[in-house]
Amino acid sequence: MELTGVTSQSIFDDNAADIKLSWVAGLEGADRAFDVEFAREATSAADLVGHLNLIHPNRIQVLGKPEILYYQRLDDEPRKRQMGELILLEPPFLVVADGMEPPPDLELRCTRSSTPLFTTPVSSAAVIDHLRLYLSRISAPRVTMHGVFLDILGMGVLIMGESGLGKSELGLELISRGHGLVADDAVDFVRLGPDFIEGRCPPLLQNLLEVRGLGLLDIKTIFGETAVRRKMKLKLVVQLVRRNDGEFERLPLDSQYLDVLGLPIHMVKIQVAAGRNLAVLVEAAVRNTILRLRGIDTLRDFMDRQRAAMQADVVSRGQGRLL
């Protein structure tokens, strides 16, 4: 996993309010990060944070009530040895959860070794779940793509195409028909799971849509709160093409896909020409994609009916010759 620039300070700043973290020791270790080799070999965020475990000392160690009670029951020598092993391998930081007070000798060791020590009243399980989700998000593969990203009938749709084909005008038409804007011009996509790509708008462009001749439009102000979305799952790409595009296929026999962050996304191509109602065509494409995701393929059904009709015709002709 790629965790460049992720330090104990950045993790604390991003999560302190959500899980009520307090920094009680090891302030000098603010720039401490994951071991590079350990982070590279990690296959998921579950490898990076968990309950106290000396077998995996390089990860974020969370100590809940059971761990603290176990630590307190140990004799001096075993306790010193175990904590010495843990501190020696420099974990990014330790978290004492469940509202427990960190043992004084643990706090002293963290101070001397510049190992960040956090406390929180939140349960250890909730802390681990929250940090795993956070680390998954910041380390996930991401890309910025050009286009207009919309919520159409509950489906995340990215409209792409050459400059000047009317992507923003089409987006404005769809918004006026009750659909929602996620982002215009630049869309940030992040792959959060094996089949899950989420798209968001960069903060600088939030709620804005640029239309030639009109300039920048604040969609939230013009159309209201329900006309914008904070994020959507990417499910469909609509590619606008010029009418003279030689690669355009009128009846594609196979589904078309666009590779986004290693995940194949359904794609449809729509020719741009005078008199065509592109908004209606996009809505129809979305409805058809919804049917395909449910296992209903209109073109395949038609081909099956046509094949059955041709076979029946051949059989009837053969019987006619026999008569």
Swiss-Prot record:
Family affiliation: Belongs to the HPrK/P family.
CDD domains assigned to the protein according to its UniProt record, in alphabetical order: HprK_C
Species, as recorded: Cupriavidus metallidurans (strain ATCC 43123 / DSM 2839 / NBRC 102507 / CH34)
Active site annotation, chain numbering: 146, 167, 185 (proton acceptor), 250
Annotated region (Important for the catalytic mechanism of both phosphorylation and dephosphorylation), positions in chain: 209-218
Domain remarks: The Walker A ATP-binding motif also binds Pi and PPi.
InterPro entries, sorted: HPr(Ser)_kin/Pase, Hpr_kin/Pase_C, Hpr_kin/Pase_Hpr_N, P-loop_NTPase, Ser_kin/Pase_Hpr-like_N_sf
Listed name of the protein: HPr kinase/phosphorylase
Gene3D superfamilies: HprK N-terminal domain-like (3.40.1390.20), P-loop containing nucleotide triphosphate hydrolases (3.40.50.300)
Complex formation: Homohexamer.
GO MF annotations, alphabetized: ATP binding; magnesium ion binding; phosphorelay sensor kinase activity; protein serine/threonine kinase activity; protein serine/threonine/tyrosine kinase activity
